[in-house]
Swiss-Prot record:
It comes from Shigella boydii serotype 18 (strain CDC 3083-94 / BS512). This is Small heat shock protein IbpB. GO terms for biological process: protein stabilization. One of its GO terms (cellular component) is cytoplasm. The gene is ibpB. Pfam families: HSP20 (PF00011). NCBIfam families: PRK11597.1.
Amino acid sequence: MRNFDLSPLMRQWIGFDKLANALQNAGEGQSFPPYNIEKSDDNHYRITLALAGFRQEDLEIQLEGTRLSVKGTPEQPKEEKKWLHQGLMNQPFSLSFTLAENMEVSGATFVNGLLHIDLIRNEPEPIAAQRIAISERPALNS
């Protein structure tokens, strides 16, 4: 029998908490750039990406349907450096997150190398039952 670890997929599905929490605890590898997904309450979430060395103009956030995409294209240095140790990555990246229905991006900020994307769940008002009056005459001409 083969086991598949779906937690790396589920951690990017925001708003699907019960299923995501069950699978996320199995352990997962990090990708570049490192990021956190924070849940403030049942309707408010925040994605934070650590982007040291990036500028605001290097970043692009796009929401298409339920897919939230974040792309970064850093400015390349004029001359190639010789590294003794390179622990900080400054490379182009593209991340995408699948949002649950009714999730919306409420704003984004870039402060001190951290990109914060705030999300809110807007539950639609339930459609109230409509009472239909019954008349004595037929509704259709027959």
